[in-house]
From Swiss-Prot:
Listed PANTHER family: MANNOSE, PHOSPHOLIPASE, LECTIN RECEPTOR RELATED
Organism: Crotalus adamanteus (Eastern diamondback rattlesnake)
Distribution of this protein across tissues and organs: Expressed by the venom gland.
Summary of subunit composition and partner proteins: Heteromultimer; disulfide-linked.
Function: Interferes with one step of hemostasis (modulation of platelet aggregation, or coagulation cascade, for example).
Protein's recorded name: C-type lectin 13
Secreted among keywords: yes
UniProt subcellular location: Secreted
Signal sequence, renumbered to the chain: 1-23
Superkingdom of the source species: Eukaryota
Amino acid sequence: MGRLVFVSFGGWDVFLSLSGTGADCPSDWSSYEGHCYRVFQQEMTWEAAEKFCTQQHQKSHPVYFRSSEEVDFLVSILKFDLFWMGWRDIWNERRLQWSDGTKVNYKAWSAEPECVVCRATDNQWLSTSCSKTHNVVCKFQA
């Protein structure tokens, strides 16, 4: 939804439409390229972060990235270094195949699912236990 702004300059009254100037995000969310972001400086497990983001907005999930410019935008609004990304179980759920092309039917990964955090200082993605606690940035498409 667009926003209208009323401005009065002396005897001139002007209405400005702000529709089309960016994503229509809730007032406490930041917008970038048609998505809404909200930074939460609250440490929680990955499962709790996923649930928490959905509670903040029904279409929201821990952040994921489509470009380095998006990372730069997010880093500009962060006040902490490590945060959950919307990616989990990277080893147990991958569709793996052996070097000869046959499907991997037997797996012996650790039982602990793996999740991913982003280190904002150098944009490195790190695999870590989903049971650890980190901050979260929630994201949804506007």
